[in-house]
């Protein structure tokens, strides 16, 4: 079980996070298996939601990386026909281009963060190829799959939310700095063989491991 103190929210933060800093309307989802154009923040390639609606998001895909953090109650996400039953505190990273759908709690209750962001700004960094390979399939991060790094990873994402809803003039830069910390931490442990096989999507097979070995050679 994930320690709840790492991701619990005060009522004041809930109230703050319900409102997008720059967007009046809610998230728009495309038709089943259609491309979704993420409504990014102006002059940025990211968007964060504090989501408490029981809506079901039909099968779709986009060029952005999607990260889902369950905060209260369960949340079911299907990525490329693999089903993930997220528990409070679980982090699921969905890679760009992956078909996925989201099913809310059947009782209509639940809270979660949904992050959408593009990482192409890091592609010019030679070492970033290791990150792309480590996250080429869906990745589940929690206290069971990644006990050595879970506290760091969930703390970084909660910091992302605080910065996103702050009035910092450099908040986008701060968020990308935090995201880079998140991906570096996981990738370092992945390359060192410290990540549980349960963290990686079952779609990750020997071909994926071979790709990593090729990068390291």
What are these model-predicted stretches?
Residues 97-126:
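Ligand-binding loop in jelly-roll beta-barrel domains
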Residues 1-78, 82-84:
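Generic protein-terminus/edge-of-domain signal
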Residues 81-96:
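Short acidic-glycine-tyrosine-enriched beta hairpin
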Residues 150-153, 176, 196-217:
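A short, Lys/Arg-enriched amphipathic alpha-helix from helix-turn-helix/homeodomain DNA-binding modules
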Residues 4-5, 130-181, 185:
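Amphipathic alpha-helical segments enriched in hydrophobic/aromatic residues interleaved with Lys/Arg
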């Amino acid at each position: 079980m994930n320690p709840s103190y790492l991701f619990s929210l005060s009522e004041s933060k809930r109230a703050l996070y319900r409102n997008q800093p720059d967007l009046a309307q809610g998230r728009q989802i495309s038709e089943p298996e259609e491309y979704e154009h993420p409504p990014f923040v102006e002059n940025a390639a990211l968007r964060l939601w504090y989501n408490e609606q029981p809506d079901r998001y039909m099968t779709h895909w986009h060029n952005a990386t999607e990260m889902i953090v369950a905060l209260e109650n369960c949340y079911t996400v299907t990525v490329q026909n693999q089903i993930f039953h997220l528990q409070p505190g679980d982090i699921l990273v969905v890679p760009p281009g992956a078909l996925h759908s989201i099913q809310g709690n059947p009782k209509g209750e639940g809270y979660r963060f949904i992050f959408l962001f593009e990482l192409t700004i890091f592609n010019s960094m030679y070492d970033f190829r290791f990150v792309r390979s480590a996250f080429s399939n869906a990745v589940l991060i929690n206290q069971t799959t990644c006990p050595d790094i879970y506290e760091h990873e969930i703390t970084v994402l909660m910091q992302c939310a605080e910065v996103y809803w702050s009035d910092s003039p450099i908040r986008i830069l701060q968020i990308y700095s935090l995201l880079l910390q998140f991906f570096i931490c996981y990738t370092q442990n992945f390359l060192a063989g410290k990540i549980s096989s349960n963290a990686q999507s079952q779609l990750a097979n020997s071909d994926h491991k071979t790709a990593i070995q090729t990068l390291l050679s």
